[in-house]
């Protein structure tokens, strides 16, 4: 009598290959819906220094306040949204100090707050998608705060009432490049699981790193001038149902690159006093010196010749700050309007870490449709999304934009 492997057709190589092919989608992963959400408390940037120094009991630091105010006014941010106001912060003097132990209180705020904000964005994306929750097969949740077990993906699935057999993935503590990371994950999941529909959610709360000003640590002051709270969600899937699902962008290729010898350019450390932020003045130059290589690499990896003029693409770079955008724009010889969507989101919301590039996707598709352009990508077919963050890590996503329907 032969072995099971010899006699069973289920164990044949041909059968395994057939199963593999049957599990794969036919087409490319597409973004089918986008939703965004932010907390209710609005803080105009031109008066943020007054609020910040008052809320942190630091008004006696007159010269430091003047310096911080100048920093705020150079950011090209108009306003930001937070899940706290001054009255709320008065309950937590350990958070508004510079380095008092405060992680427990920060965690108590972030652990429930992050999935709750993510739920708001997810519901908007699901409503636009128009399909029942039961069609969601995978969940990718991303945040840089509220580390806990069960993790934020579990909590969000429970809040939404997703099926208990949804495949969940949690992306913790990746920082500002992670909006690109989740698109890379979603592409792989959608294309390797036929019929799958991936709910992608990024949610960020800045209270994990909020702290009072300190003359010897201006990096944190810069962080406090840039970051805002927000959440964004996508539905990603391949082979959209014609007439029912409405694809916006195709995720053609996704690649991650670590810039050599750049680990100290941007780094953050979670400590008893919360998330400590460190950023070198060299960060804009480090990114701009390496971004073109990432772009050339992704085009060549799919057998395409990189464009002779980068202005022929639509652009969704992460708005790490005004200086980073200015340097990248100059290095690639881009016209000022190419970063319109990114600069608009930076002005309206600040730097929302991983959620930012998803907000920019939403802004670009909405403006393109409102202007009657031929594609959601400002009338252009091809574009790139760029995530920059600690490491230094660059996520490069090649997108193909589709016409509005």
From Swiss-Prot:
Segments traversing the membrane: none
Other facts noted in the record for this chain: A.arborescens is a medicinal plant rich in aromatic polyketides, such as pharmaceutically important aloenin (hexaketide), aloesin (heptaketide) and barbaloin (octaketide).
What is the name of the protein in this document?
A: Octaketide synthase 3
Instruction: Note the PANTHER family from the entry.
Output: CHALCONE SYNTHASE 1 (PTHR11877:SF80), HYDROXYMETHYLGLUTARYL-COA SYNTHASE (PTHR11877)
This protein's pathway:
Secondary metabolite biosynthesis; flavonoid biosynthesis
Region annotated Disordered, chain positions = 1-22
Give a yes or no for keyword Acyltransferase in this entry: yes
Which residues are listed for CoA binding in this entry?
283, 320-323
- Provide the GO MF annotations for this entry: acyltransferase activity, transferring groups other than amino-acyl groups
Biological processes annotated in GO: flavonoid biosynthetic process; polyketide biosynthetic process
Q: Which keywords are on file for this protein?
A: Acyltransferase, Flavonoid biosynthesis, Transferase
InterPro entries for this protein: Chalcone/stilbene_synt_C, Chalcone/stilbene_synt_N, Polyketide_synthase_type-III, Thiolase-like
Q: Of which family is this protein a member?
A: Belongs to the thiolase-like superfamily. Chalcone/stilbene synthases family.
- Organism, as annotated: Aloe arborescens
Compositionally biased spans, kind Polar residues: 1-10
Task: Name the lineage.
Answer: Eukaryota, Viridiplantae, Streptophyta, Embryophyta, Tracheophyta
Indicate whether Lipid biosynthesis appears among the record's keywords.
Answer: no
Site positions for Determines the polyketide chain length and product specificity, renumbered to this chain? 209
Tell me how this protein assembles.
Homodimer.
Task: Write out the catalytic residues in the record.
Answer: 176
Q: What does this protein do?
A: Catalyzes the iterative condensations of 8 molecules of malonyl-CoA to produce aromatic octaketides, SEK4 and SEK4b, the products of the minimal polyketide synthase for the benzoisochromanequinone actinorhodin. May be involved in the biosynthesis of the octaketide barbaloin.
> EC number(s) in its UniProt entry?
2.3.1.-
